[in-house]
């Protein structure tokens, strides 16, 4: 199974991935407003 180090790495990766997805989504949604 997972140990604490693997779980921490997975949590960090998931958090960073979600953060990047939110930023990308914000750019895609907000971009037309600048034109």
UniProtKB/Swiss-Prot annotation:
Cystine crosslinks: none
Cytoplasmic topological intervals: 30-35
GO cellular component, one term: endoplasmic reticulum membrane
Alphabetized UniProt keyword annotations: Endoplasmic reticulum, Membrane, Signal-anchor, Transmembrane, Transmembrane helix
Lumenal side: 1-8
Membrane topology of the entry: Single-pass type III membrane protein
One Pfam family named in its UniProt record: Ost4
Compartments in which it is found: Endoplasmic reticulum membrane
Transmembrane segments: 9-29
Family designation: Belongs to the OST4 family.
Quaternary structure annotation from Swiss-Prot or TrEMBL: Component of the oligosaccharyltransferase (OST) complex.
Function: Subunit of the oligosaccharyl transferase (OST) complex that catalyzes the initial transfer of a defined glycan (Glc(3)Man(9)GlcNAc(2) in eukaryotes) from the lipid carrier dolichol-pyrophosphate to an asparagine residue within an Asn-X-Ser/Thr consensus motif in nascent polypeptide chains, the first step in protein N-glycosylation. N-glycosylation occurs cotranslationally and the complex associates with the Sec61 complex at the channel-forming translocon complex that mediates protein translocation across the endoplasmic reticulum (ER). All subunits are required for a maximal enzyme activity.
Protein name according to UniProt: Dolichyl-diphosphooligosaccharide--protein glycosyltransferase subunit 4B
Name of the encoding gene: OST4B
């Amino acid at each position: 199974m997972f140990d604490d180090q693997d779980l921490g790495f997975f949590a960090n990766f998931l958090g960073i991935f979600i953060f990047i997805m939110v930023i990308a989504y914000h750019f895609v949604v907000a971009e037309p407003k600048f034109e």
